[in-house]
Swiss-Prot record:
This is Large ribosomal subunit protein eL38. The keyword Ribosomal protein applies. Coiled coil: none annotated. Keywords: Ribonucleoprotein, Ribosomal protein. InterPro entries: Ribosomal_eL38 (IPR002675), Ribosomal_eL38_sf (IPR038464). It comes from Julodis onopordi. It comes from the Eukaryota. Belongs to the eukaryotic ribosomal protein eL38 family. Pfam families: Ribosomal_L38e (PF01781). GO terms for biological process: protein-RNA complex assembly; translation. GO terms for cellular component: cytosolic large ribosomal subunit. GO terms for molecular function: structural constituent of ribosome.
Length: 70
């Protein structure tokens, strides 16, 4: 089941959970989508600012598997 997150802090909390398996980063021309897979839900965060997206990518937990799509 997908869920959308609007706050960056909420996304980072979800990414640091124990059941978070992987993060997919999908880059589009107008936005960047971060999708974190947890045991029950797939949480999605949409960011339109490219600089914020790069900062968020750097602040992801190191043990998490990160996959970039496009």
């Amino acid at each position: 089941m997908p869920r959308e997150i609007t706050e960056i802090k909420d996304f980072l909390l979800k990414a640091r959970r124990k059941d978070a398996k992987s993060v997919k980063i999908k880059k589009n021309p107008d936005n960047v989508k971060f999708k974190v897979r947890c045991s029950r839900f797939l949480y999605t965060l949409v960011i339109t600012d490219k600089e914020k997206a790069e900062k968020l990518k750097q602040s992801l937990p190191p043990g998490l598997q990160v996959k970039e799509v496009r």
